[in-house]
């Protein structure tokens, strides 16, 4: 479902593809040098974050970080230059027929990026609308109207413009 939903929601942005790639062929056809270049570009100290929790001092953490990470070459600074997804100006629909355990309905709307101040309102709305059996969607559409066997509302929480999703199993 997510493969179809992402491709429907995003026309230009890389979010239209799953993290592993657009098609399995991308992985199958990758050459060892391609994989090494990708690893070198994305998995280096210049692009890393280290989080430490526990019973240790700042000085201990710095000493251990220097011991284990300082010998690793920093790598080139990687700056993503991705154009934002153009505004969606019309509804997009897709109906998929497949041999699945239950029918489902997925609806999605574009939302602000995670660092936008309005993101927090979206987070609260999705909790009220579709998180758990006490949520408004569950009470109305599962309990009262019995249109769905389950329903939820959530957001993708993406760094760039994400999606608010409602999905229901029929």
Task: List PLM regions with ranges.
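His/Glu-based metal-binding/catalytic segments typifying zinc-dependent metallopeptidases
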Residues: 7, 77-136
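Short amphipathic alpha-helix segments
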Residues: 136-144
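Charge-rich, well-structured scaffold segments of protease-associated domains
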Residues: 1-77, 95, 113, 121, ...
